Each structure stands twice: as C-alpha cells, then as structure tokens.
Amino acid sequence: AGEIVRRRPYLKVKRLPALYAHNRHMRVEIVYFDGCPNWQEAGARVGAAAAGLADVEITYRRVTTDEEAAALPFAGSPTILIDGTDAFDDAVPVTELACRVYQTDTGLMGLPTVTQLNEALRRRQSRS
C-alpha cells in the first residue's frame, strides 16, 4: 500500500513503489467534484491499473465551481489525467460540474475499466 500525503486540503497524493528503475515518473491526477459518485472508485481502479508500473503518483483535485472546471482540462467527473493530459482520446471538455461517462466493452459507464486504465498508462509510458 502506498503512502498518503496531504499537500493541500483538496489534494491527496498516493505514491506507488517503483519496481523498475528504468521507467520515468508518471503523475496521474483524478479531477472530481463532491457530487460525483465515482471519484473514489476511480482512484481504486487507477491504483489497480498502475500495479507493477514504476513510480506512479496518484493525486486528487477537487473542483468546487464551474469556473474551476472551465479553467482545467476537465471532461466531467472523474477526469483522469496522465501527466496533465486526459487518459482517453475521446474526452470532451466541459465548463461546469458534471459527471462523465466512459465507453467500455459493456457500454457506457461512470468509470473506465481497470484494463482501459492499464492500457492508457502503458501507452503513456511507452511515449516517454
């Protein structure tokens, strides 16, 4: 299990152990608002998807206003950013607090699957 560090009241950091020294650090940020029922499970799925990958930092950013949402790369809650870029190419930015849906093999869901997240992390890792 990783260590939780509080940097700001709205930002939690969980570091997963590095297993392979040759891979670079990756930062995954989960952008959410409190009314979203899926943001905590998103963190659990990202953690599961990152298992076995080196030096992955998982952070959470709580969005509280439409203005904040408009100023961020936010495509609805939960938005999962890898090194500041949406993990999925089909992201459509929104300017208000809204829930997001993801296309999965079983249809539209409020979260991507662990497999989809693992593929997104590995794609991003291979680009570095």
Predicted features, each with a name:
Residues 72-76:
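Thiol/disulfide oxidoreductase modules built on the thioredoxin-like
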Residues 26-48:
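Local sequence-structure signature of Cys/Sec-based thiol-disulfide redox active-site neighborhoods
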Residues 78-87:
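A short, hydrophobic beta-strand/beta-hairpin element that forms part of a small beta-sheet core
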